[in-house]
Design a protein with these regions (language model features):
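Primary mode marks residue(s) on the alpha4-beta5-alpha5 output face of response regulator receiver
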Residues: 17-309
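Hydrophobic membrane-insertion alpha-helices, especially the h-region
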Residues: 1-14
């Protein structure tokens, strides 16, 4: 028996000897920069989301580009966290302070911001009041090459339009953010749901999955130099509600109502410019009638079930 065991072990050891194979190793292909329209497939996290996040006193990018996170990008499927709006060649190849990064219109960071605005379809400011700014939004996330890509000599900076929910947290979403500021067709996950209607105390955003009283659609600002007429605000808010919810009629057969709220702001004590007197924040909102509450977003609800209880 002992002789048999030793023989078997000897055979195994013999088979485990290293075999020499002719030829030379060939390095696999290193992925290049992302393409416009590719998707961010993981959450960017709180620390790296936001165009102006970070420590203003620190440099944004080191000489090897390690100042920006390398996040997983690829073909869009499921619920992405963002979309590549553009790529700046040799973006993170020099160290920049916060002021250098965002104070210079030609900096890679500022270029990224412009690319994201173009990708979202952000319109130019209108001279016709009220100038409504949609409440659903996206944030700029800057993405750098991976360690392997940097070793391959890549120094690009990816400009990602990332989704954020009403509380400002990164979120996955259905559909696309491409052109949403122009078409007013927003992923419902970007809705800004409110515990109560806006007031002088401000706006209290809540998770849209919990019962809430209202949903904020858009915001506008007015003062004596840019006055807003209540009738114009009401009419334009109703049109916004129709476009943003996808409802044929924004009252949904009397179950919900569009509501415009004007909240006076304190005057600026540091200016003598009388044209800025009577500053007012205007809110375009939508809410259920009576004592009912919303149990989900109305944003993009279309022909789906109305989230009213």
């Amino acid at each position: 028996m002992l002789v048999l065991v030793v023989a078997v072990l000897a055979a195994l050891v013999g088979n485990a000897r290293t075999k020499h194979v002719a030829g030379s190793a060939v390095r696999g292909q290193v992925p290049g920069p992302p393409s416009v329209g590719e998707c961010l497939l993981e959450s960017p996290g709180v620390a790296v989301s936001g165009a102006f996040g970070g420590d203003p006193s620190s440099g944004y990018a080191s000489t090897d580009g390690t100042g920006y996170p390398s996040l997983r990008l690829g073909s869009c499927s499921g619920r992405p966290f963002g979309e590549v709006a553009g790529v700046v060649t040799d973006g993170p190849d020099r160290r920049r302070s916060y002021q250098e990064a965002w104070g210079d219109p030609s900096s890679p960071e500022s270029q990224c911001s412009d690319m994201v605005n173009a990708y979202l379809g952000t319109p130019e400011d209108s001279d016709v009041p009220p100038q409504w700014g949609p409440a659903p939004s996206s944030t700029l996330v800057l993405v750098g090459p991976s360690d392997l890509q940097r070793a391959d000599g890549q120094h690009w900076l990816g400009c990602v339009a990332a989704g954020v929910d009403g509380t400002g947290m990164p979120t996955g979403y259905a559909g696309t953010v491409h052109g949403m500021m122009r078409t007013l067709r927003f992923p419902p996950e970007l809705a800004q749901c409110l515990a109560v209607q806006p007031s002088t105390a401000g706006v209290t955003a809540v998770d849209c999955g919990q019962p809430h009283k209202a949903e904020l659609l858009a915001i506008s600002y007015a003062d004596d130099s840019r006055p807003v007429q209540p009738d114009d605000a009401e009419r334009s808010c109703v049109e916004l509600a129709r476009s943003m919810t996808g409802l044929a009629h924004p009252t949904a057969a009397g179950r919900i109502q569009v509501r415009v709220i004007a909240v006076p702001l304190p005057p600026d004590p540091n200016t003598r410019d009388t044209s800025t007197a009577n500053p007012t924040q205007w809110y375009c909102t939508i809410e259920p009638k009576g004592d009912n509450v919303l149990t989900g977003p109305l944003l993009g609800v279309g022909d789906g079930p109305l989230p009213v209880r």
